[in-house]
Amino acid sequence: MRVSFTKMHGLGNDFIMLDARAESLPPMTAATARALADRKTGIGCDQVILLEPSDSADFRMRIFNADGGEVEACGNASRAVALLHGEAANVETSGGVIAIAPASGGARVDMGVPRFDWEAIPLAYAMDTLSLPVGWGELEAPAAVNVGNPHVVFFVDDADAVPLDTMGPGIETDPLFPERINVNIASLTGDDALKLHVWERGVGLTRACGTGACATAIAAMRRGLTGRKVAVTLPGGTLQIEWDADDHIIMTGPAAESFRGTFDWGDYS
């Protein structure tokens, strides 16, 4: 079966977009997602995004990481979907329904309300998620938040100085996090401005992570480090994050189409 795809990215976090809203595709498996995402033998991406019909929203977005695992949310992919769809829409995800819309220079996404209770992260046992009483070497007392998917956020003096490539895997897979965890290292760079590096669950180091930017901004706001509108700069660029009066997280930032093509599904199944 010959299948069309669109390659897109949000601040360098890149996606293979597959649209099954009008015409069904074969079932997506972990093996197929891994094969498509492979940068040497496949098309190559951080996530495979599958758009499907939905009974509860305008359509459904499914997200498969490069390791083949299906995850709940992806902020950068949500902006890419907004650009691809071309108009405002409510989108069903495994993490809940989000609202997307094209915006000047990219897209705007209402990521919904963050969750802070330890069961929602989830953690293996009860802890204060504003400051977990745990540490990994020089990294201590992170905040934890679920913004559709689970994150821990460490605030340090210099985010660039932390060897996240070596520390990330151990934190991601720590038994404290039964569903694994996304790891964020952040430092304040000015009034309502943060620098961020992210080890993404199932992906590794990434140039940008939209949900990571949301989680980090919310953690900074909860700790009184910033106001309720924050600029978060990642290696791939900057996102604007707002925690609005209704406690919804609003993310605004760029997305772009890279190219389009086709592939034979059988080659990747």
Swiss-Prot record:
| Localization in the cell | Cytoplasm
Any Pfam family hit: DAP_epimerase
Query: InterPro entries attached here?
Result: DAP_epimerase_AS, DAP_epimerase_DapF
The record's GO molecular-function terms, alphabetically, read: diaminopimelate epimerase activity
> What GO cellular component is one of the record's annotations?
cytosol
Q: Binding residues for substrate, per the UniProt record?
A: N13, Q47, N65, G75, N76, N149, N182, E200, R201, G210, T211
User: Which chemical reaction does it catalyze?
Assistant: (2S,6S)-2,6-diaminopimelate = meso-2,6-diaminopimelate
Question: Can you tell me which residues form the catalytic site?
Answer: C74, C209
Q: How does it assemble?
A: Homodimer.
Q: Which family does it belong to?
A: Belongs to the diaminopimelate epimerase family.
State what protein this is by name.
Diaminopimelate epimerase
Organism encoding this protein: Erythrobacter litoralis (strain HTCC2594)
